[in-house]
Amino acid sequence: MYELVQVSEKCYYINCPAKIGVYVADGENVYLVDSGNDKDAGRKVRQILEKNGWHLTAILNTHSNADHIGGNKYLQGQTGCKVYSGGIEAAFTKYPVLEPSFLYGGYPCKDLRHKFLMAQESDVTDFSDENFPKEVEVIPLPGHFFDMVGFRMPDNVVFLADCISSRETLDKYAVSFIYDVGAYLETLD
């Protein structure tokens, strides 16, 4: 687990529970696509980056589920990187209590305020910021969560977040969370 897998000249993914994308913008500056589920994931990611001599420039969040943003705070604190997000996802990333509140229908009881539903807060910069990497295309992928997006890198590698689930994931969880079924079906088309 936490193995770096190369998929193109400049794109990799870190094989872990919530796959983390890596885009090498130049010889040493990299962008992550999501950050894993917690501080421990962030620490393992940082070790992989350091081992390869890479500097983390920013994290590009696909959506605000805790398993995709849980490493943000740790990595931001360790590297000073930016965290990019957009729309409602940016609000949920900045104020993570919103996710269990949304799922529960009110302020979540203590049993719902844990790292699997509520990541630590991140300082967020919107995708529209002038420093967002111009070579990265943001692709709207609504359905699974409010404003989920994917990213197309310059070499046409596309990171699709939770738009598509593996057989293993479907077998493990049996029921997949879909916020908007109609939007999800349109995204798959």
Where would I find each of the regions flagged by the language model?
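Short, flexible active-site-adjacent loop segments at beta-strand->alpha-helix junctions, enriched
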Residues: 18, 87-89, 97-99, 142, ...
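Short Pro/Gly-enriched beta-strand edge/turn motifs at strand-loop
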Residues: 3-9, 110, 131-136
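Metallo-beta-lactamase
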Residues: 37, 135-189
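Short gly/ser/thr-rich secondary-structure transition/capping motifs
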Residues: 14-15, 117-125, 139-142
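Active-site HxH/HxHxD metal-binding segment of metal-dependent hydrolases
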Residues: 42-43, 47-132
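Conserved beta-strand hairpin/beta-sheet module of binuclear metal-dependent hydrolase folds
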Residues: 2-52, 150-161
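Hydrophobic positions within alpha-helical membrane elements
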Residues: 15, 39, 68, 91, ...
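Active-site neighborhood of phospho(di)ester-bond hydrolases with catalytic His/Asp-centered motifs
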Residues: 33-36, 56-65, 83-87, 140-143, ...
